[in-house]
Amino acid sequence: MEVVTNGSMHFDPQIHTLPFVRARSSFLLAVILASASAFTALGGTRQLHLSLRAHADRLEANVRNSHLKSIEIIQAFLCLATWAEVPTILCRDRTWSYVSHAISLAIELRLDQPLPHCIQSDPMYDQGYNELLIRNAHRTCLLLFIHDRVGIILTYVSG
């Protein structure tokens, strides 16, 4: 997780440790592992990447079908949007789907609030992680805004 948290604006190295991510969201963990396995310098192979990506896709379908909501799920969709493979055909680009679903989850969880309810009800909130969890929610909300704006700008530029 150290490699991921040091080079990514998505995660906070103080809370996004391997035990934290493992305990909170198997979907986020699978997405991180699938994204990291795409880079052979980190020890990934093509077969490993395909297996992890297929697992992440199965978990994504489960998350959507079960209507699950959490900040970690939003972060997983942001990672999928950020590290998505460039499709050979534009109609296969799923970035818009990842970002739009993440935005709808953020709206439902009210991440734009100064103190989102999902943070107040978090078991870690009472364990001294208040500021880190609030900052995590606000960072996620800001990244969604950036993804949305960049997508609109690219749409205007490209056509």
What are these regions (language model features)?
Residues 104, 109-159:
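Fungal transcription factor middle regulatory core
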Residues 1-80, 88-91, 103-108, 112, ...:
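Acidic, Ser/Thr/Pro-rich intrinsically disordered transcriptional activation regions
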